[in-house]
Amino acid sequence: MKTNTLLASLSDYFESYLPEVKGFSDNTITSYQYAFQLLFDFLYEEKGLPPEKVTFDSLSNGTLLEYLAWLENKRGCSPGTRNLRRTAVASFAKYALKNNFGDALQFYSNVKDIPKKNTPKNSDIKYFTKDEIAIILNAPDTRSPIGKRDVMLLSLLYASGARAQELCDLTLNDIYFGTETNIRLVGKGSKARMVTIPENSAMMLRNYLSSKNLNTSSAKDRLRHVFSSQTHEHMSISCVEAIVKKYVVKSKNLYPHLFKRKTYTPHSFRHSIAVHMLECGESLVVIKAFLGHESITTTTVYASVTPELANKYLRERGKPLESVDSELPPHENTRTATLSFLSKQHH
């Protein structure tokens, strides 16, 4: 049987090339893995192709365009997220061209011919109002261990402005209780930042860890993850997504006149704290540091949320707003579970 050069190339690409040759961060590799998990999902659902049957020849220009349209129309991805998925596929195409010239030449050409999609200026930011945050944080049933975990997770998503992956990776070693409680978050490019959380969140965190018999002073507990799923000690992004979706649906059913946006994700909590900080008069420079943005340009998108915030920004800065793409993490794809290179953690 002829070896599937596409799958072999993908395996080398994710297991050796990206982490060892390119030195990409875990978060970037995970993002690229998700792009291919979703591509295989699309090919199975829409084309009837299981992962082991997908070859370079399967990835025609038309099929790739259909995949990108599927991301937007079926999964509700923004143009910015669609572009990120395209970039992941294009990056692999360049690698495959160098290593499998004959097989990958047409595939590379197909990807290269697909332009990035223009993203609208100041596109809609999916954030929660302060009332909506209060409702969601009251949604879990804290009489159960799962409910206690979920309310802590949702509270910390908001209080820390953490990305979903940052919260999944949080260990007891990253928590510093004291006069102020700080947590260490490792973000894009493996860059770490310290974030101070409010006193009420700190008290919740102490009580939560105590309920799980975890002690930040204990050497054996220091490397334990703060949040775990029912099956894994290290929670996945898809699990965080499912938790957020569960309580958004519950809250929408209870308060149908609120939660007007079509979709919300874990990133909505990060957006929310940024908007609420700006509404309370915090400067964009402080918010930039809090969120771990490399450029102030990224942070300025929050000033476009309301006319009042836009006017406040223009008075302070005197220049127009610029847009920024924000990646939304996809759901877990069980069909690709046998492809270990699409789920392997690189540390």
Named regions from a protein language model:
Residues 1-347:
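Conserved catalytic core of the tyrosine transesterase superfamily
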